[in-house]
UniProtKB/Swiss-Prot annotation:
The lineage of its organism: Bacteria, Bacillati, Bacillota, Clostridia, Peptostreptococcales. Pfam families: Gly_radical, PFL-like. Residues 38-774 form the PFL domain. InterPro entries: Gly_radical (IPR001150), GRE (IPR051215), PFL_dom (IPR004184). The active site is at residues 507, 509. This is 4-hydroxyphenylacetate decarboxylase glycyl radical subunit.
Length: 902
């Protein structure tokens, strides 16, 4: 009798003396027929037993060719470097794989890009070298130190050095990394950015904002691409040979012709040459895998496995040149192109887009011809899920853990509408849901673009998937998304039809797309794909509660002893004065961060611009211009990201109520209580980052009254206009302020209101707040989720609070709910979940996502992480393995209000 997936994993873990527990057993039992294929289970086992590995092969060949081509046109020089790197990647095929290729020669991992950012490796170079020397004498016992981070290499062991708290690198590769990093000192995007940023007269303010974590990180060199939607149209419609031929013809037409533009018109020749160079590198990479598959076929003795290798050879040799003929070939090509895209740059959030609609032409024709069965399609999609989950993003420890939580945000959107306004749901999208229910991996996360035109059975299927506790699909209001597209991109020619092509880029960034006409075997299909720049580069995460803290502290950060803003020297005698100073500080922050980011991105586009993503997205090939020259159709995508909105709103409400309306306490008494953390230890000392289990040190009771009053003050999420109107006023103001900001492309910006994981580290950097939150504890998640435990009047009261403002005028908002599994048990429970979701979206909510798990399970998983290797939770726009999350985020998820009735 065959084992279930859970039994299989349990047996593997128990063989290592690890106990296994599974979330949502009651809901899982409803769908106990949902099992991944044996092949997918085996490959998932490989993933569970694989560590994230940093590899120097790609950067070595990139760097070598880049030096060799010194003096060439920058975009061509970069293309040659990418070509060399792809051409020399060592192929690695795991037994049983039907979808092959990966970021590096390792099953899971990534690589550093010192040409983008090298300071971390230079600064840590000596430490890493010393650690590499020391490791030679380490004993096997030190292996036991690792484990609680899942696949993260959080500590060095054996022959492996931990880098950025996530990746393991073989000690012999460390000197190569350090040497290469030193070569880029003063030349990297990061260093050049810093050099020119310092020419801003208010550069010190920018540095202070970064040092105090009011701003989380510089996006211009950390993650310059991503949080956008890829476009697979050109490879799928023309094949790689076809794109080369197109570029060659365009070269002939534009060589020496400025076409009325004496500046960038001449750049077209160099861009088309760069396209040819890069695609030739991709073709070599694919064909190297074909050669490797042919070799494996030659030594394989099992006839079935031998045939599988033979099939891989045929598929890879074909897609290296031509339009895919079958569903499997199309799936392999899109996956290959996706890996190529994320290998080009430091990228997180290169989202897949409307995948079920993109691959539908091949699915439809293969099914009609009897070339494939639905079960075979589901297995391929399961294997695809595992491969996407293997993608890692190399970034600093602060970005990887503090922002991304190790996630890469390859979001796949389902539902929505077609170009003509009819439902976008199709049978392949149902199979995507089925595959995600059988093979529960964090990637690709699913997002349902909810529209009233979508079929009920399709929506019920999605609700069933959500019930399993994997955190997806998240639900997004399709109407809100198209409204925002029309508002933000009207100046660039956005139409209603094209607005329907949007999808989610990254975890929750609404990203513009377009429709292209794909022809397969004489039949034409309209498919959507990305058509815009990064929808998540710009000002990266302003800590709203921290700005308020500095208002109260006269511009000074007492934790760091830094005078961040010029002292306002105002007595703050009125609530209006507090608001006035807050707005002034906030606008100062946006302004200086916007200009610094513009400099960083300008240097990036000049020296490290995208070629792969440029050739993929409209209208770069038509214009002959890369992303840096606004080759994309839509360029008004850069944003201002914020964090801790509800913590800020609750704090304003407490100040207004206690200090200014009721006059129960003076502003000085409030400041004193905040500076002394209401008589408690800092969360960093306690080691718990939610409000639970905090330790009181003041024995006099000096702060008891004000602390209780702050906790009892009006809170957002209870349909109480006292607090909710503060949110409304803030949102209206923020939208206008962001529109006044201007990106390097001279386009207006807009608010992006997601926390990802920044509410952990930014909360850790913030003193106590007037709402009663203690120093160092995590902020509220998302942007319209209630602060943990403060939503007392039920979920529908929370919905009323969240929709007090027009969520369609900004890029996004974020609502997280935690439901006990028994709340939505059975078919009626599924309907209840769908009705709950509908209720919020029909009221104008933009986004809602669910954790269907009980808090006791999470608490046990925190104590015994190795027992819950496959447990996943929804954080803030993304799903991640519990054991790969940092403790501040774990504490926040545990503390969220758990609804047992809806």
């Amino acid at each position: 009798m065959s084992q279930s997936k859970e039994d299989k994993i349990r047996s593997i873990l128990e063989a290592k003396n690890i106990k296994s527990n599974f979330q949502n057993k009651e809901n899982l039992s409803e769908f106990n027929e949902k099992k991944a294929s044996k092949r997918a289970e085996d490959l998932l086992d490989v993933y569970y037993n694989t560590l994230s590995t940093a590899d120097m092969e790609f950067p070595y060949w990139y760097n070598r060719e880049y030096r060799k081509s010194d003096g060439d046109i920058p975009v061509v020089r970069r293309a040659k470097a990418l070509k060399a790197a792809f051409s020399h990647m060592t192929p690695n095929i795991i037994p049983g794989e039907k979808i092959v290729m990966q970021k590096t020669r390792h099953y899971r991992g990534s690589f550093p890009m010192p040409w983008v950012s090298e300071s971390f490796f230079v600064a840590q170079g000596e430490q890493m070298r010393e650690e590499a020397k020391k490791l030679a004498s380490n004993t096997a016992d030190e292996l036991t130190k690792f484990g609680s981070g899942g696949g993260n290499v959080t500590e060095s062991f054996g022959n492996v050095v931990s880098i950025a708290g996530k990746f393991g690198m073989r000690k012999e590769e460390v000197p190569v990394l350090v040497k290469m990093a030193k070569e880029w000192v003063g030349k990297s995007v990061e260093d050049l950015g810093f050099h020119y940023e310092k020419m801003m007269p208010d550069y010190d303010l920018k540095e202070n904002l970064m040092s105090t974590l009011i701003c989380m990180f510089d996006s211009g060199y950390t993650l310059p691409q991503g949080r956008e939607v890829i476009n697979y149209f050109y490879p799928l419609n023309y094949g790689l040979d076809g794109i080369i031929e197109m570029a060659k013809e365009c070269k002939k037409a534009v060589a020496g012709n400025a076409s009325g533009d004496g500046l960038i018109g001449m750049d077209r020749l160099y861009f088309y040459e760069a396209v040819i160079q890069v695609i030739e590198g991709l073709q070599t990479w694919i064909l190297n895998y074909a050669k490797h598959a042919k070799y494996l076929e030659s030594i394989e003795t099992d006839l079935e496995a031998k045939k599988e290798y033979s099939d891989l050879v045929e598929i890879l040799e074909h897609i290296a040149h031509k339009q895919p003929r079958t569903f499997r070939e199309a799936l392999q090509l899109t996956y290959t192109i996706h890996i190529a895209s994320v290998n080009e740059d430091a990228i997180s959030g290169m989202s897949i887009g409307r995948f079920g609609q993109i691959l539908y032409p091949w699915y439809e024709q293969d099914i009609e011809k009897g070339l494939i069965t639905k079960e075979e399609v589901i297995e391929l999609l399961e294997l695809y899920r595992i491969k996407i989950t293997c993608i890692d993003c190399f970034a600093s420890a602060g970005v990887n853990g503090g922002v991304l939580s190790g996630n890469t945000f390859n979001t796949l959107s389902i539902g929505g509408l077609k170009e003509d306004g009819s439902t976008g749901a199709n049978e392949l999208e149902e199979l995507l849901l089925e595959a995600s229910m059988r093979c529960r991996t964090p990637q690709p996360s699913l997002t349902m673009l909810y529209d009233e035109k979508l079929p009920e059975d399709f929506l019920m299927k999605a609700a069933e998937c959500t019930k399993l506790g994997s955190g997806y699909p998240a639900w997004v209001n399709n109407s809100n998304g198209t409204t925002f597209m029309m508002k933000q991109f009207a100046d660039e020619g956005m139409t209603v039809e094209e607005a329907r092509a949007f999808a989610l880029g990254g975890c929750l960034e609404t990203s513009p797309g377009c429709w292209k006409q794909l022809t397969l075997n004489g039949k034409t299909y309209s498919i959507a794909g990305g058509a815009g720049q990064s929808a998540g580069s710009g000002v990266h995460f302003i800590a709203n509660p921290k700005i308020l803290e500095l208002v109260l502290m006269n511009g000074k950060d007492y934790r760091m002893n830094i005078q961040v803003f010029e002292p306002h020297n105002k007595p703050l005698d009125t609530y209006e004065e507090v608001i006035e100073v807050f707005k002034d500080y906030y606008k100062q922050a946006i302004n200086v961060l916007e200009r610094a980011n513009n400099i960083e991105l300008d240097i990036w586009r000049k020296f490290d611009t995208s070629i792969i993503n440029s050739l993929l997205k409209p209208d770069c090939l038509d214009k002959g211009q890369h992303i840096g020259n606004m080759g994309y159709r839509y360029n008004a995508t850069l944003n201002v990201e914020t964090c801790g909105t509800v913590t800020m709103v609750n704090s304003f409400a407490a100040l207004k109520k206690l200090v200014y309306d009721d006059k129960a306490f003076t502003i000085e008494e409030m400041k004193d209580a905040i500076l002394n953390n209401f008589g408690f230890k800092d969360a960093l000392e306690v080691g718990n980052y939610s409000m639970a289990d905090q330790v009181k040190v003041d024995k006099t009771g000096k702060y008891d009254a004000i602390y209780k009053a702050c906790l009892d003050a009006p809170k957002y999420g209870n349909n109480d206009l006292y607090a909710d109107n503060i949110l409304k006023n803030y949102e209206v103001w923020l939208s206008k302020v962001c529109e006044e900001a201007q990106s390097l492309y001279a386009k207006k910006m807009y608010p992006c209101q997601i926390s990802v994981s920044t509410h952990g580290p930014q909360g850790a950097a913030t003193l106590a707040t007037p709402d009663g939150r203690l120093s160092g504890t995590t902020y509220s998640d998302g942007s319209v989720s209630a602060y943990a435990g403060t939503d007392k009047n039920g979920v529908y009261a929370l919905f009323e609070s969240a929709t007090i403002w027009d969520q369609a005028v900004v890029q996004n908002s974020q609502m997280n709910l935690k439901l006990h599994p028994t709340t939505i048990k059975g078919q009626q429970g599924t309907k209840k979940l769908l009705d709950l979701t509908r209720s919020y979206l029909r009221k104008g909510g933009f986004h809602i996502q669910y954790n269907v798990v009980d808090s006791e399970t999470l608490k046990d998983a925190q104590k015994n992480p190795d027992n819950y290797r496959q447990l996943m939770v929804r954080v803030a726009g993304f799903t991640q393995y519990w054991c790969e999350l940092g403790k501040p985020i774990q504490d926040e998820v545990i503390a969220r209000t758990e609804y047992e009735g809806v």
